[in-house]
Swiss-Prot record:
It comes from Culex quinquefasciatus (Southern house mosquito). The lineage of its organism: Eukaryota, Metazoa, Ecdysozoa, Arthropoda, Hexapoda. It is found in: Cytoplasm. Component of the eukaryotic translation initiation factor 3 (eIF-3) complex, which is involved in protein synthesis of a specialized repertoire of mRNAs and, together with other initiation factors, stimulates binding of mRNA and methionyl-tRNAi to the 40S ribosome. The eIF-3 complex specifically targets and initiates translation of a subset of mRNAs involved in cell proliferation. Keywords: Cytoplasm, Initiation factor, Protein biosynthesis. GO terms for molecular function: ribosome binding; RNA binding; translation initiation factor activity. GO terms for biological process: formation of cytoplasmic translation initiation complex; regulation of translational initiation. This is Eukaryotic translation initiation factor 3 subunit K.
Amino acid sequence: MDHYVKMEDGKVMPIQEMLKSIERYNPEHLKVIEAYVEDQAKDNKYDLEANLACLKLYQFNPQMMNLDVTYTILLKSLTNFPHTDFVLCKCLLLPAQMNDDSVKEIVYLADILEKCDFTLFWSRVQKNPQFFKKITGFSESIRKFVCHVVGITFQSIEKQYLVRLLGDVDDKVLNAWVKKNGWKEEGEYILVAQQEGNIKTKHITEKIDFENLGPLMANCL
């Protein structure tokens, strides 16, 4: 769904265009930005700039702070791991937000993800599944990150261990992720791409000027 903001002169501007201007700091646009944040959660889309703008407006206007929207922004940032979006969002939080129990839980989840303790992460999510249901594609996004970590860490992995890392998924979901990543099932193991294929040779080029080379050659005579 497209979102537009109305300027003081009556002109209508797309929200993405507004975010590139000084108008992003206008509190009159906050309701539109908040609606845009909620639509991101519903439509499985993501706009970090809009989410940061929303948190910045809360900083400037604490009386307008909305905790539900804050939860949505933080949970959406988790879905973009391993990028550092969550850190950027966390830096903009007010004390009132940081002291909220749900925010503390999301911060804890981010810490767990950063440590790649995926079994603990899923156990925390399963304690309050309703809290995450409003974020369409939340589990799939986290599983994408899990597969990213597995892909750069393992050459082969026990099938049941991978099942746990993905959140105790069934065979259908497991097979879908194995196929999506180009892995192969072999007995009780999943064969991950060879790590040698992920190693990139680094070429170092050193530039030596002729003026610097002259004295060196003279010393060799």
